[in-house]
């Protein structure tokens, strides 16, 4: 069965972080409570109760072995240490210095990493840069005839020749004349005389003279009347118009050599 002292010590151990000062209590009474205190809290209690510093060396030894066991493995002699409180402070400062150096290195490395990320970050552009555009396909004649004054001169010469050829063709087509047909009922003698008077040229088609003034539309009417006259029962034969000699019509063999051949 626990005594009142033991019950009070157990409650004080659970709430050791709330104890600020122990006053003049002897070390043997508060030792179980101080064993549960953290090193920083123990330093505060020792400053407020200086009589505890003489008896708290075993407590500091336990803190050193628990917090800096790896650092003390390099030390071969630990029995000659008298001030465990001072050793704990030195090791704590050394560890803090290492932590500060490591944190500075980590901070600088993180800053460099952020800068590299910013440099490699994809930024949308309104217009594609010229270096990233695909190369233009060269024109078929660009490799053989680069753009220069020679090309411009050749182009101008070609346009001049094309315009001159166009004018020649238009003049030839406008000067070409078509043959005139002889009206029916024209005598062969008049046609022969007319052909001799107006010789044919080498570049134009032969022209047929106009009918004389004496030849009027009455001749066509008489010819049509004779042609369309109905046959009577008394006369068995059908009246026909007078025949025209072949010399009246132009001889096609004369014009074959003068008419331009089709290509």
UniProtKB/Swiss-Prot annotation:
One Pfam annotation reads Elongin_A
The record ties this protein, via InterPro entries, to: Elongin-A_domain, RNA_pol_II_trans_fac_SIII_A
Xref: Gene3D superfamilies: 6.10.250.3180
Compositional bias ranges of the Low complexity kind:
230-245
For the region Disordered, what residue ranges are annotated? 112-147, 170-263
The UniProt regions of compositional bias labelled Polar residues, in chain numbering, are 186-206, 214-229, 253-263
Q: Which GO terms describe its biological process?
A: transcription elongation by RNA polymerase II; transcription initiation at RNA polymerase II promoter
A GO molecular function held by the record: transcription elongation factor activity
Quaternary data: Heterodimer with elc1. Component of a CRL3 E3 ubiquitin ligase complex consisting of a cullin, the linker protein elc1, the substrate receptor pof4/ela1, and the RING protein rbx1. Interacts with skp1.
Q: What does this protein do?
A: As part of the CRL3 E3 ubiquitin ligase complex; polyubiquitylates monoubiquitylated RNA polymerase II subunit rpb1 to trigger its proteolysis; plays a role in global genomic repair.
- The protein in question is named Elongin-A
- Biological source species: Schizosaccharomyces pombe (strain 972 / ATCC 24843) (Fission yeast)
Q: What is the lineage of its organism?
A: Eukaryota, Fungi, Dikarya, Ascomycota, Taphrinomycotina
Q: Which gene encodes it?
A: pof4
